[in-house]
Curated annotation (Swiss-Prot):
It catalyses: orotidine 5'-phosphate + diphosphate = orotate + 5-phospho-alpha-D-ribose 1-diphosphate. Homodimer. It is an enzyme of class 2 (transferase). Pathway: Pyrimidine metabolism; UMP biosynthesis via de novo pathway; UMP from orotate: step 1/2. Orotate binds at T121, R149. Keywords: Glycosyltransferase, Magnesium, Pyrimidine biosynthesis, Transferase. It comes from Methylorubrum populi (strain ATCC BAA-705 / NCIMB 13946 / BJ001) (Methylobacterium populi). One of its GO terms (biological process) is 'de novo' UMP biosynthetic process. This is Orotate phosphoribosyltransferase. Catalyzes the transfer of a ribosyl phosphate group from 5-phosphoribose 1-diphosphate to orotate, leading to the formation of orotidine monophosphate (OMP). Coiled coil: none annotated.
């Protein structure tokens, strides 16, 4: 699947939005990728995650376990794991706490794991996911996402592959360009805004 085909999946689903958005990180952006619109369509999700599994295999080889951060990463993680023939597990957090691996999930010795995210903006969720796996016996070999909107600047601590890398601007609320500041902001994501 080419980058343009991936973006067309988002466009045709109405999931590539323009306006003034407050991202989960608290940063502001003129573009928002509403991935849950994508994940509400099983056929579209299957196409994208099959393509992501191919990219993962090409870069990292054999994968035994896909680990995703809850909630946004669970659907693409599961569907990508299905195409990899791997197990799908996830990390979750108590409100305000760190991610933890629960529910009897583990990464046993000798296994190779990859973190699968939906969209990477700063890499925070993937970094927090990786930190929660530090005591696992298996090896976390890399990370993957459908769209890397950081322009390749997301800091994860692992090699990152994606179907598309975009350089979508994100601004601090106190450094907005005038054209963005003129539009009332909306908060479409799921994570609570950071406390000032």
């Amino acid at each position: 699947m080419t980058p343009e085909e991936v973006l067309e999946e988002f466009r045709s689903a109405g999931a590539l939005l323009q306006g003034h958005f407050i991202l989960s990180s608290g940063l502001r952006s003129p573009t928002f990728l509403q991935k849950m619109t994508i994940f509400s369509d099983p056929a579209r999700t299957e196409r994208l995650c099959r393509a992501l599994a191919e990219v993962i295999t090409a870069r990292f080889g054999r994968i035994d376990i896909v680990v995703s951060p809850a909630i946004g990463g669970i659907i693409p993680g599961y569907e990508t794991a299905r195409h990899l023939g791997a197990k799908a597990i996830f990390v979750e957090r108590d409100p305000g706490g760190p991610f933890t691996l629960r529910r009897g999930f583990s990464i046993p010795a000798g296994s190779r794991a990859v973190i699968v995210e939906d969209i990477v903006t700063t890499g925070l969720s993937a970094r927090e996911c990786l930190a929660s796996l530090k005591d696992e016996a298996g090896e976390v070999v890399g990370a993957a996402c459908l769209i890397d909107r950081s322009g390749g600047r997301g800091e994860i601590g692992l090699p990152l592959v994606s179907l598309v890398t975009l350089d979508i601007p994100a601004y601090s609320p106190d450094a907005l360009p005038p054209e963005l500041a003129a539009i009332p902001p909306v908060k479409p994501g799921s994570r609570a805004l950071p406390k000032p």
